[in-house]
Amino acid sequence: YIITQNANADLKWETKKQTNLGLDFALLNNRLRGTVDVYDSKTENLLFDYTVPQPPYPYPTIKANVGSISNKGIEVSLAYDVIKTQNSTLTLAGNASFMKNEVLNLDGSINGVPLNTDYVGWGAANSYLVKGKPIGAFYILEHTGKNENNVETVLDRDGNGIIDQGVKSPDRYYAGSALPTYTFAFNPSYRYKNFDASLLLRGSGGNKIYNGLRSNLSRLENIGKSNVLASAVDQGIYTSPYGSDLWLEDGSFIRLENLTAGYTFRFTDKYIDTIRLSLTGNNLFLITDYSGIDPELNVSGSGRPEDNFGGDRGIYPRTRSVAFGLTVKFK
């Protein structure tokens, strides 16, 4: 048997305090409807795996309640019936949310042993928990090019002639967060007599993604050893000891999540009331500047920290599907 985690008898639930101010409204004989919700929340006693010294602890990390974070934002939804008659309706609906996240505090200790709560690694490479910044803050080296030996070069910000790759290195700079600052969706629907159609567009933005997969496949030293991207030839970087912002990309996207069209046949038969035929497409297209497979990463990833929350080391692509539907309603 081996020890895989340290015991902590003082673990408790995270606590959250939240204030909401909401408004629901309907105007123009209920043709214009909407909601507005403003919130301010604070979560304390955050559960997280922190680094501890060995000894006295047998395992290098311990799950503990340390720190607090703040979330502030606004959520808005609107729907408007552009056409509303007996035979046809056209409704435009959508929602959007904007959020500001901040790490308020990370100080803490267990039984007098201080925890490493400053610049704690969070998910992707070069992503940390830093007081005063959003969770998943990227502190990273700035790519400047390559030298005569085709080795990547980065900016020496403090000018001391040494590239410091330490967590608190003065050569690192804040380059954004893995957490989106806004999300949105657009959901129009149309009906004319027995025909109906609807779609769902959604997206998010304001976040960064560290494309670790692209980084691993962009070194010419790996030619003949493993796969290398065609773009690596143009970049011409033979090797690199750095994880620079060359691989940090915008994670914004717009996705056509769903498109459905259908027609309903009505019967006077004593057994069948209606038969509806429909055609549905899911994940039909994606608009993004991200060069990876998909900018919408799973927060849980594969279970490895480097694959979580803003890090992409290779994910399964989302399935694109087209389905035919038949719905029979009996009397």
Segments from the language model and where they lie:
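Membrane-embedded beta-barrel scaffold of Gram-negative outer-membrane proteins
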Residues: K12-Y57, S97
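C-terminal beta-signal and terminal closure region of outer-membrane beta-barrel proteins
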Residues: K63-N71, D118-K146, N227-A230, Y238-G243, ...
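Conserved small-residue
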Residues: A64, D81-A178, N282-G292
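Transmembrane beta-strands of outer-membrane beta-barrel pores
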Residues: V38-E44, Y80-V82, A96-E102, Y192-N194, ...
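Transmembrane beta-barrel architecture of outer-membrane proteins
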Residues: T15-T19, V38-E44, P60, S70-I74, ...
